[in-house]
Every structure is written in structure tokens, then in C-alpha cells.
């Protein structure tokens, strides 16, 4: 309804009927189990040339359903590697897919012309099409998305359980802790289904992680500083080698950290400077826990261009600015 109201959609329907027989492409954007139910209804409706695709984070369950229903020639699994911890149409934007990887998982029976057509369509949206087998896709997303979400949620639970009645840990957990656990605020309904549908890969990786954490505990018991040093060094080296020129599964956060004096009106001055230069703010505030942060004032912006422009504007006024 929101998309219709703002003009993105020309029309929408609340039931599946023969109207969908004229569709060239149908995107299934509900949770995996719901999409599988929709497939059963669509089978007798869509035309032979219609392309069916989904945007789910797990591929093998829906690919299996497609095979059972005899719809392989019409289906290409899809997974845009974009998003944030916020869900729903209100948090979408018109450049969401630009320079983002878009996984495609066609079956052996998918019509070649449909694969070519859909790849061109995806590239036309500014995304980078990458073809994978369903099982490859599910392991990759378990490693770089599903397990990290579980770990982020567990870190939050760890602090929540350790917090006392006065809520001191919550009060002090701003800055770095809130950044690394941001994805723990994702939709519980969506993650319930993801974990159910990709449980095998998730359990394999979590078991490996538990083993590694136990090794850290063992080495701490031995007071093995060299091991701890190498542990962080290897992690840092690999993390620094990860490219950031394209969008990944986690929506990139564009931030400026600014050194400001503790004086009345300082935040308003900074905000006014940015507004005067047509730079929109997503959020702005003082960082009270700055153990791992640079700068007193944190400014969250909407995109990389705004971030660079904002830094330039403030630096020209002699503010010390750090870009993240």
C-alpha cells in the first residue's frame, strides 16, 4: 500500500489469480516457507515464458520445491546481497542494488534465454550478477551472514545477562559494541526461518567456532601471549584484505567522527553547516564511550558521497574529522 501511495507501484493485489498469467517476471519476496506455498498456487497460473525468482537468503529448500513441482525451467533463485538491520518497504531506497552482488542459482533445466534475460535485467539495476549452485550459496551465506547474525545476537544476550539491576552495562555499551551488534536488531521472524532452512550449514560453522573459542580459553589458561597476539594479527590481516568497493550483505554505515569542544551550541553549529551545504543527516549524537572511537561527535549520513562532502565542509572550518 505504501508503494502504491508513493507511485512506485501502479497496482497491487492481495490474492493470486489469473491476473498473474500475463507477468514476465514474478519476484517471491516472502519468507521461504511462504514462497513455497505461493509456488503451488502459481503453477497453474503463470505462462510458459514467465520467469519466477525469489530473494531469499537460503536456496536449497525452494530449489527442492521447484523440482518437485516441475517448475525448474521457469525458475532462477535470486539473492541480492544488500539490506540492513531494518526491514520493510519504508527502509528501501532507489539505489539499494547499485554495485551490490546479486546471487543467481539457476537449475540445470532453467531455460537459457531466461537466465540471459534475468542477468541483463539485474545488471540494468546496477547490481553484479554472480551464478552459484544452491548448495554453494547456502554455505557462503551461512558463513558471512547467518552465523554473524547469531553471534551478534549472542553478544547482546551476553551483556544483557551480565547487566545488573542498575543497567550500567546498557548505559556504557554505546560506540563500538553497538556497531558490531547492529545486525542483532534484524527481523526475528525472518531469522527464525533462515535458521530453520539453513540449519545444517549454520550448525557446522557454529561447531567450528565453538572449537576455536575453546582453544582461545585453553591458551589463556596457559598464559600464551604469543598465541593471543597471532590470533588477533591473523584476524586483522584477513579483515583488512576484505574489499569494500562493493556492497555486501550488511548495509554499509556512513559515519563521520568529529572532534568538538564541550560548548553550548557546538552540535547545532555542525548540523547547520551540513544543512547549509544540502547534506542530510540520518543521526547525530555525542559518543560517551570512546574507548575504540575517534572523535566526540558521531554523524551518520545516507551515502558515501554525503560522507565525503560532509568531511570536506567541516575540515574547511578547521574541524578534525575521521571518516568510517
Regions picked out by a protein language model, each given a short descriptive name:
Residues 238-324:
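A conserved regulatory-domain signal marking ACT and ACT-like small-molecule sensing domains
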Residues 1-8:
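NAD(P)-binding Rossmann-fold cofactor-contacting core
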Residues 10-15, 130-132, 323:
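Short acidic-hydrophobic, aromatic-tinged amphipathic segments that line or gate anion-handling sites
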Residues 16-51:
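Rossmann-like NAD(P)-binding element
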Residues 96-183:
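Internal alpha-helical scaffold of NAD(P)-dependent oxidoreductase catalytic cores
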Residues 165-235:
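Interdomain hinge/lid region at the active-site interface
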Residues 40-90:
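Rossmann-like NAD(P)(H) cofactor-binding subdomain of soluble oxidoreductases
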Residues 27-28, 53, 104, 152:
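Redox-cofactor binding/interface segments in oxidoreductases and associated redox assembly factors
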Amino acid at each position: 500500500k505504501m508503494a502504491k501511495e508513493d507511485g512506485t507501484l501502479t497496482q497491487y493485489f492481495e490474492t493470486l489469480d489469473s491476473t498473474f498469467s500475463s507477468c514476465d517476471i514474478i519476484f517471491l519476496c516472502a519468507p521461504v516457507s511462504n514462497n513455497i506455498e505461493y509456488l503451488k498456487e502459481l503453477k497453474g497460473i503463470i505462462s510458459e515464458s514467465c520467469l519466477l525468482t525469489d530473494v531469499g537468503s537460503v536456496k536449497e529448500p525452494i530449489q527442492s520445491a521447484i523440482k518437485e513441482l516441475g517448475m525448474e525451467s521457469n525458475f532462477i533463485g535470486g539473492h541480492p546481497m544488500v539490506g540492513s538491520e531494518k526491514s520493510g518497504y519504508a527502509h528501501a531506497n532507489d539505489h539499494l542494488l547499485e554495485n551490490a552482488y546479486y546471487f543467481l542459482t539457476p537449475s540445470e533445466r532453467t531455460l537459457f534465454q531466461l537466465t540471459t534475460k534475468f542477468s541483463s535485467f539485474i545488471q540494468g539495476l546496477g547490481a553484479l550478477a554472480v551464478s552459484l549452485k544452491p548448495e554453494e550459496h547456502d554455505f557462503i551465506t551461512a558463513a558471512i551472514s547467518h552465523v554473524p547474525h547469531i553471534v551478534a545476537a549472542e553478544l547482546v544476550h551476553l551483556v544483557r545477562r551480565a547487566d545488573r539491576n542498575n543497567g550500567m552495562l546498557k548505559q556504557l555499551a554505546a560506540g563500538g559494541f553497538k556497531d558490531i551488534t547492529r545486525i542483532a536488531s534484524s527481523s526475528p521472524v525472518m531469522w527464525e526461518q533462515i535458521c530453520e532452512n539453513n540449519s545444517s550449514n549454520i550448525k557446522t560453522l557454529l561447531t567450528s567456532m565453538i572449537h576455536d573459542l575453546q582453544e582461545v580459553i585453553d591458551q589463556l589458561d596457559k598464559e600464551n601471549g604469543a598465541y593471543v597476539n597471532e590470533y588477533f594479527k591473523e584476524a586483522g590481516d584477513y579483515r583488512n584484505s576484505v574489499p569494500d568497493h562493493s556492497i555486501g550483505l550488511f548495509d554499509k554505515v556512513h559515519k563521520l567522527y568529529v572532534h568538538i569542544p564541550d560548548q553550548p551550541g557546538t552540535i547545532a553549529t555542525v548540523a547547520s553547516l551540513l544543512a547549509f551545504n544540502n547534506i542530510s543527516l540520518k543521526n547525530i549524537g555525542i559518543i560517551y564511550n570512546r574507548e575504540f572511537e575517534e572523535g566526540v561527535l558521531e554523524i551518520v549520513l545516507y551515502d558515501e558521497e554525503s560522507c565525503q562532502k560532509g568531511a570536506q565542509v567541516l575540515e574547511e572550518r578547521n574541524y578534525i574529522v575521521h571518516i568510517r
